[in-house]
Curated annotation (Swiss-Prot):
Record-stated family: Belongs to the PyrI family.
Plastid recorded as keyword: no
Name under which the protein is recorded: Aspartate carbamoyltransferase regulatory chain
HAMAP family xref list: Asp_carb_tr_reg (MF_00002)
Gene Ontology CC terms, in alphabetical order: aspartate carbamoyltransferase complex
General function of this protein: Involved in allosteric regulation of aspartate carbamoyltransferase.
Short name of any one Pfam family annotated for the protein: PyrI_C
Keyword field: Metal-binding, Pyrimidine biosynthesis, Zinc
Cofactor: Zn(2+)
Residue numbers binding Zn(2+): 109, 114, 138, 141
Cofactor binding note of this UniProt entry: Binds 1 zinc ion per subunit.
Length: 153
């Protein structure tokens, strides 16, 4: 029996590959982190087969590298993700997101009375690890929410 080990998503010469994104989360990451606001080529793989996860999403962004802050902000959506730095088609660095203390300019406060909806301010949430959950506390209204509530917003 032979195995077909072809790449299902084309390799990139230089840039970032975000791998092991839970299935159905890839598009959310693209929009929340404004990854599409670039002139660079972006390749997206959705519902790809994965031995570990069953199915996964994958994002490849050419000639773009994520900051440590951006990598860590992925932890809310894709805690098992691997962020690979690619140079000349080789993986030259790997990192995994770890939960940051704060998340800025990404999420929207679910409190409709929060000042962040009416004023031109950047969103800011403090991240707090709980026993079975992650809580996010808005800097402006000071209300605390389960991360699932904020992510669904």
């Amino acid at each position: 029996m032979t195995h077909d080990n072809k790449l299902q998503v084309e390799a990139i010469k230089c840039g970032t590959v975000i791998d092991h994104i839970p299935a159905q989360v890839g598009f959310k990451l693209l929009s929340l982190f404004k990854l599409t606001e670039t002139e660079q080529r972006i390749t997206i793989g959705l519902n790809l087969p994965s031995g570990e996860m069953g199915r996964k999403d994958l994002i490849k962004i050419e000639n773009t590298f994520l900051t440590d802050e951006q990598v860590n902000q992925l932890a809310l959506y894709a805690p098992q993700a691997t962020v690979n730095r690619i140079d000349n088609y080789d993986v030259v660095g790997k990192s995994r997101p770890s939960l940051p203390e704060r998340i800025n300019n990404v999420l929207v406060c679910p409190n409709s009375n929060c000042i962040s909806h009416a004023e031109p301010v950047s969103s800011c949430f403090a991240v707090k690890k709980r026993a079975n959950d992650i809580a996010l506390k808005c800097k402006y209204c000071e209300k605390e929410f389960s991360h699932n509530v904020v992510l669904a917003n």
